[in-house]
Amino acid sequence: MSIIVVKKEEQAQGSFNNGAILENKPIGFPQDNGVQKAYSNLFYWAHAYSTEGSTIGLHPHKGFEIVSYVLKGAIKHYDTKYEKWLGVESGGFQVIKSGSGISHSEELEKDSEIFQIWFDPNLNESLNKEASYADYNSEVLPIEINENRSIKTIVGENSPVKLDTEGIRIQEINIKKNFLLELDSNYSHSIYVIQGKVILNDKQIEKDDFAIVKKEMEIQINGEIDSKLFIISSPTTPSYTTYINS
């Protein structure tokens, strides 16, 4: 049984364009100074936000599966394959399968906030695939509602989003009452608090804190009404050698 908590102040920090875009990183790059590095097949996770709006210029990616979830506002994406700007609004999701190589530019509009997460889909295979891009509006992502919580499934059962990375499930949970969440004990469950305060078993976390739950079959979630969690479940030990373990 294991619950690791990474407070916001323990996470790596980043910025672009003289602070026009700011980041806290629950999972930092290997060279970053935050306490949590890559594990499972999660390589990187940033929470990025901008009050004024800003664009990150064209830059390359290879191999990794890079997803962005819009928490607030909107983002735009341009890449060297499709050669046009495409937009995603609040609640939407975009997937870049960078494969053998693609360059892209990204814009956060004014007062926007996103997660950007890099998954390791098995680079031995992905580097030999053609790059691709897809995006999904919030309306196509299924939501299950009961008296205790609503669960939006971004990746997983009944979602149109398909990732190459093994065993990934992504959900956004809005808490109405305290409830028990069933878990797969063979998976690592990575939890970011989007808003509010919650207690996971006996661990208290609040907005922008991060927790990793391992070797648990269930977890008690007690939270303020309308607290919101973003949860990624991933195999604790993937069936392939990841970049970080190569």
Question: Which residues make up each language-model segment?
Answer:
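Jelly-roll (double-stranded beta-helix
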Residues: M1-S246
